[in-house]
């Protein structure tokens, strides 16, 4: 700042949201390589009144793309240029400047917010602070965390936005984009066509409804920029226009204007009712109304959402860089719980998840440049080539340990078994190495206690993203995870527990001395808890003593007991069934397809069949030695039970043969291809095509031809869909069913003679049901 005198005014409150108002580059020794950014902060003072505050920061060039795959390829001048384009377009233009370079905008959004947090000093949105504002410049200089504030549990004040804007977009333009990029989401294709050609229908109606704790407005427009034909409520009850004169660096004076909410700082929208285009149409209208009058610097108005990814994304979100300055949250339903989930995600990540994806937690870190690995960890990793044992583990388990002691299908009984799982395992290791990352640590700690379930995908994304962003950190975490697995295995052996299968962050095995006939389920669980505690102590010792890591006791690894079991059956490393016959609790069955509801129903029946097979053996073998005669009797009854199971399943699915949602599968990335032109006439359905597509297979008119894939969710409910090819959906499921039954028959065969085989071809016998 060039101001020679600073006059501070202090005010208590908290930050609700922060958005880039404008940005620029300027010459000078301190900023010649950086990007200057003016932030608008929507704040709430201690009296409960919303107040606008503004802060100027400089994002250094080396910080701009630090955690991006772009590396240092995007200059500060480029960032300033795209921001200028997003604030100087026509007032009726769509805020689609990020289309085609969304990653660059996400990088700008994340790095600028990270810099703002470090410069001002606040911990997070909604945490109580004391604002220090220079009255000479109008700029916020500092925020001092207030640890002793009376109100330390601030939460968002939410309103509800509903909008309907059935915009028509040139079908030929959408088709061209869809054909040009194989597998492009139709939402992306529509936005591309909209940005290039605009609306094909000038009189698109817009219906808007906003509900806040103390206000309600509704407007209905015949076309977007015409006067409303229906109105209810006053916009002044919703927000007001506020102007401020600011003096920026270089003594440059500007006037800014914002929409300041009266009773909300977040608007929630139900994604099943309101499309992103409808929200953008509403905000575009408000933007034009707010800045149609000249005399102020216009803010950036740029949209970031899953529709901007050509392949779509797994999660729904809505983010605008710049205008309107408050937060817009997408919810799966209008229910209170869904809104609570959305606001929790926003509060814990300052709105950076899921919009910035794998980079989100890097932008929440207290540092700019990531700190190096702890010295002892670095030294041990450097010794790997000379240490054969460690080298083998690292080479063979380069994504985490996956191992089993079994070479063929096996069934286990007579001894108690248990399954264990480390809570938030890989993020916990990261936090043990870098305990200064308090924001991540808070979420990891909550996940250890089964809290913040909505952020579990964020943690998974964070760890997976390390492989691309910080590969050395990723390799170090895998190295430590593998060392932990060896430590756990040794500790378990000392406790009389043999690990059978170990998969990354969990394992199951058998207590060698706990007989199921002599020990009850509660006693077995007590033994499992004692084993978990012993493993936790051993792992904590490994991390603290051998690796030299210094972290708080609250962040010590937690090994959770998933269950104790009397019987087990495993047919491959990732396929197993565990059951507690004494308590008759639902079995733990993994390694079976579950992509559709039909698959999940068969999985449930298969799990029940395995329980039945166990009970049959218990009944037949009671007080007898298991021999070939008993095996043959058992196997015959199991085969008969398997027949009854698939017949019951076929009867069940027969009643659902015309129900698309029952058969629906998520399309795999490798299957994605251009959508046929016949889907391009349903614009309102295309706007929802930004997630992995759901498909069903329908019968080919040619009886000898392959089934046809139908993207049924992109069709209106009144569409006539050809008969579902149930047999095509069932074929892989029944194949798995038959294969596992044969593995079961092999697992129980302790004799040299061949096992009985389940030779049925269920589909061949019952295919007539689905013709």
Curated annotation (Swiss-Prot):
Keywords: DNA replication, Host nucleus
InterPro entries membership: HSV_HEPA
GO CC terms in record: host cell nucleus
Domain of life: Viruses
Listed GO biological process terms: DNA replication; viral genome replication
Pfam families registered for this protein in UniProt: Herpes_HEPA (PF03324)
Cell compartments where the protein resides: Host nucleus
Task of the protein: Component of the helicase/primase complex. Unwinds the DNA at the replication forks and generates single-stranded DNA for both leading and lagging strand synthesis. The primase synthesizes short RNA primers on the lagging strand that the polymerase presumably elongates using dNTPs. The primase-associated factor has no known catalytic activity in the complex and may serve to facilitate the formation of the replisome by directly interacting with the origin-binding protein and the polymerase.
Family classification: Belongs to the herpesviridae HEPA family.
HAMAP family (alphabetical): HSV_HEPA
Subunit-level organization: Associates with the primase and the helicase to form the helicase-primase complex. Interacts with the origin-binding protein. Interacts with the polymerase catalytic subunit.
Protein name listed in UniProt: DNA helicase/primase complex-associated protein
Taxonomic lineage of the native organism: Viruses, Duplodnaviria, Heunggongvirae, Peploviricota, Herviviricetes
């Amino acid at each position: 700042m060039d101001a020679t005198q600073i006059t501070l005014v202090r005010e208590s409150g908290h930050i609700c949201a922060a958005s880039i108002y404008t940005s620029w580059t300027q010459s000078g020794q301190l900023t010649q390589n950086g990007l200057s950014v003016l932030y608008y902060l929507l704040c709430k003072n201690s009296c409960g009144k919303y107040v606008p505050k503004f802060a100027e920061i400089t994002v250094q060039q080396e910080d701009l793309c630090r955690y991006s795959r772009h590396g240092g390829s995007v200059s500060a001048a480029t960032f300033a240029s795209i921001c200028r384009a997003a604030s100087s377009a026509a007032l009726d233009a769509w805020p689609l400047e990020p289309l085609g370079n969304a990653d660059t905008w996400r990088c700008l959004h994340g790095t600028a917010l990270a810099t703002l947090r470090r410069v001002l000093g606040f911990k997070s949105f909604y945490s109580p602070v004391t604002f220090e504002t220079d009255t000479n410049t109008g700029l916020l200089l500092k925020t001092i965390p207030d640890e002793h504030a009376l109100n330390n549990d601030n939460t968002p004040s939410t309103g509800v936005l509903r909008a309907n804007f059935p915009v028509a977009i040139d079908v030929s333009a959408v088709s061209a984009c869809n054909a040009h990029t194989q597998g492009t989401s139709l939402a992306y294709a529509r936005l591309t066509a909209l940005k290039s050609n605009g609306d094909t229908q000038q009189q698109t109606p817009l219906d808007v409804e906003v509900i806040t704790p103390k206000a309600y407005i509704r407007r209905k427009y015949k076309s977007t920029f015409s006067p409303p034909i229906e109105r209810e409520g006053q916009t002044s009850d919703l927000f007001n226009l506020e102007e401020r004169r600011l003096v920026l660096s270089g003594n440059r004076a500007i006037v800014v204007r914002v929409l300041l909410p009266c009773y909300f700082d977040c608007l929630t929208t139900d994604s099943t009712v309101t499309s992103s285009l409808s929200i953008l149409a509403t905000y575009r209208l408000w933007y034009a109304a707010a800045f149609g009058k000249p005399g102020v610097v216009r803010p950036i108005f740029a949209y970031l959402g899953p529709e901007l990814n050509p392949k779509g994304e797994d999660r729904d979100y809505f983010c605008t860089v710049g205008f309107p300055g408050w937060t817009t949250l997408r919810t799966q339903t209008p229910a209170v719980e869904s809104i609570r989930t959305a606001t929790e995600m926003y509060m814990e990540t300052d709105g950076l998840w899921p919009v910035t994806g794998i980079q989100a937690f890097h932008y929440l870190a207290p540092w700019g440049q990531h700190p190096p690995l702890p010295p002892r960890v670095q030294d041990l990793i450097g010794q790997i080539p000379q240490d054969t044992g460690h080298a083998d583990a690292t080479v063979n388990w380069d994504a985490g340990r996956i191992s089993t002691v079994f070479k063929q299908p096996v069934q286990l009984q007579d001894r108690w078994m248990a399954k264990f799982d480390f809570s938030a395992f890989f993020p916990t290791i990261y936090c043990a190495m870098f305990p200064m990352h308090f924001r991540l640590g808070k979420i990891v700690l909550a996940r250890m206690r089964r809290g913040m379930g909505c952020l579990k995908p964020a943690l998974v994304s964070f760890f997976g993203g390390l492989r691309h962003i910080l590969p050395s950190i990723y390799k170090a975490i895998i190295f430590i995870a593998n060392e932990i697995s060896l430590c756990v295995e040794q500790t378990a052996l000392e406790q009389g527990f043999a690990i059978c299968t170990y998969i990354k962050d969990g394992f199951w095995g058998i207590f060698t001395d706990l007989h199921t006939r002599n020990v009850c389920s509660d006693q077995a669980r007590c033994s499992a808890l004692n084993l978990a505690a012993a493993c936790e102590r051993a792992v904590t010792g490994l991390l603290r003593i051998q690796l030299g890591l210094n972290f708080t006791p609250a962040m010590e690894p937690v090994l959770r007991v998933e269950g104790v079991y009397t019987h087990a059956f495993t047919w491959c490393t990732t396929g197993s069934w565990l059951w507690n016959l004494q308590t008759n609790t639902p079995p733990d069955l993994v390694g079976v397809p579950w992509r559709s509801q039909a698959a999940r129903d068969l999985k449930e029946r298969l799990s029940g069949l395995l329980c039945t097979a166990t009970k049959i053996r218990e009944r037949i073998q009671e007080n007898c030695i298991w021999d070939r005669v008993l095996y043959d009797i058992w196997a015959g009854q199991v085969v008969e039970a398997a027949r009854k199971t698939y017949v019951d399943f076929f009867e069940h699915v027969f009643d659902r043969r015309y129900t698309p949602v029952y058969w629906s599968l998520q399309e795999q990335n490798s299957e994605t291809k251009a959508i046929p032109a016949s889907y391009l006439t349903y614009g309102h359905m295309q706007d929802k095509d930004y997630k992995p597509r759901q498909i069903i297979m329908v019968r080919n008119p040619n009886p000898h031809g392959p089934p046809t894939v139908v993207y049924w969710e992109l069709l209106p409910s009144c569409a006539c869909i050809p008969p579902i090819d149930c047999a095509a959906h069932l074929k892989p499921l029944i194949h798995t069913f038959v294969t596992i039954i044969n593995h079961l028959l092999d697992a129980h065969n302790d004799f040299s003679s061949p096992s009985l085989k389940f030779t049925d071809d269920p589909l061949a016998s019952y295919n007539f049901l689905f013709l």
